[in-house]
Amino acid sequence: MLSETELRALKKLSTTTTRVVGDSTLALPSNVKLSKGEVEKIAVTKKEMFDELAQCNLPTIELITREHTFNGDAIRFAAWLFLMNGQKLMTANNVVVRMGMQYSTNLAGNNVEINYVTSNSVVKLGHIPAGVLAAPYSGKGSGLFITYEQNLITNTVETGKVCVLFITSLSTTASAVNSFAYSYCNVPVESWDFNMIKLTAETSCASLTAMTNLVNTLVPDDRVRPVGLYVDIPGVTVTTSASLGSLPITTIPATTPLIFSAYTKQVEEVGVVNTLYALSYLP
């Protein structure tokens, strides 16, 4: 694999031949001096390699396939599809309402039509009725839930707002201690930006600080790595609970306008939730 500079250098050392560039070029012996065309045929540049890895493009596919594969990005789609259906790691069924789609799978595993929300003539998000959760959330796991106008913690209607909720075990899966907490916020739909939301164990924020303090109340052998809800949207406050003796939520009402939901069975796998979110929404 060559850099662009190395490729140019090889071309300068090339010669003129009467050979026709084609598949036979790859079979030329090692002691033959190549023409510029033969150099281009044989060489693989770093840029070409990275372009292929980044896009893995499927240029001739139909529109309905492009929609499902992030515009032909087969590598991204394969990773996304694996996590969406990773029931060994996560409680079924994950919900991801992706922008630009017509239908999305609900908590029951059924495809339902997406309702889109517009603010100032801009489509901000889509949501679907949650449906009936296949099995209650349980165990010492961790989950991210995004709903439209329905706060799952306070059970209140938040008109014109996107409600983000992160729940997590503070103790390890192997620990005998039951300790949980949550962080949540309500974001005005006109300010909503998928790119400004993430779970973090390293970016300083109020939620991570609060979660760290809660984790540190446990004995060292029971502690998980603290993870918080990071929201980089002006004017939005993230609230974190005190420690709790049980999961903050175990189900989602069937009529809830749901945008995203994913819950790992074991808290140590929280990074899977972040990865699924990033694959689903980030550029």
Swiss-Prot record:
Alphabetical keyword list: Capsid protein, Host-virus interaction, Viral attachment to host cell, Virion, Virus entry into host cell
Chief localisation class: virion
GO BP terms: symbiont entry into host cell; virion attachment to host cell
NCBIfam families: seadorna_VP9
Presence of keyword Ribonucleoprotein: no
Entry's transmembrane regions: none
Official protein name in the record: Spike protein VP9
Organism: Banna virus
